[in-house]
Design a protein with these regions (language model features):
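Acyltransferase
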Residues: 132-155
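Cytosolic ligand/metal-binding cores
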Residues: 38
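Structured adenosyl-cofactor binding patch, chiefly the S-adenosyl-L-methionine
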Residues: 41
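Pocket-forming structural segment of enzyme catalytic cores
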Residues: 44-120, 137, 153
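Alpha-helical elements of Rossmann-like donor-binding domains used by nucleotide-donor carbohydrate transfer enzymes
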Residues: 18, 76, 112, 145-149
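Conserved G/P- and acidic residue-centered "switch" motifs that form tight phosphate/ATP-binding loops
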Residues: 34
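Flexible gly/pro-rich beta->alpha loop and the following alpha-helix that scaffold active-site loops
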Residues: 1-31, 44-45, 49, 148-152
Length: 155
């Protein structure tokens, strides 16, 4: 079950997995954001935690929560942000078992929840956070930097 919010839309989940499989077969670039990251993992055989035990770190009733993350040296996120980045968070689910073809590249040090991965050989990556709405008043991490990198690399 994939559920980026608290509501379930099985028909939408199936459609999104089919769209991902279509893109993957054609080696099209895919950037999964939040539920999109979860969807990629499940579509490739990974599993999810349906309701994480540490919600205070990853969501807030008042909007996005911000927390520190560690980034794997040598990854594209490391090239963009270095070894640490503060990111926004608004999720109650997370990756439990990562699909075999995916490489973990960012995680929350407080609970080891995965925050980003990249595919071993295809132009596919996912982030649990929201680069499109990250606020500079809470972090120096630029979501625009990630989006620009993805577009420049794969457009």
């Amino acid at each position: 079950k994939i559920d980026g919010s608290f509501s379930i839309d099985t028909e939408l989940d199936v459609l999104q997995i089919q769209a991902f499989e279509y893109a993957m077969k054609r080696q099209m670039p895919v950037l999964g954001i939040c539920k999109g990251m979860q969807l990629i993992n499940v579509a490739l055989g990974g599993t999810m935690v349906q309701d994480i035990a540490t919600p205070q770190i990853h969501r807030s009733p008042n909007g996005d929560q911000y927390h520190n993350t560690h980034i794997t040296k040598g990854s594209f996120l490391y090239e963009l942000y270095g070894e640490e980045a503060v990111v926004n968070s608004a999720h109650h689910q997370c990756v439990k078992h990562l699909a075999k073809e995916l490489t973990p590249i960012q995680w929350c040090p407080e609970d080891n929840i995965l925050e980003a991965f990249s595919h071993e050989r295809l132009p596919i990556c996912g982030v649990q956070w929201h680069p499109e709405r990250i606020k500079q008043e809470f972090t120096t991490t630029s979501g625009d930097q990630l989006l620009a990198h993805f577009l420049q690399r794969y457009a």
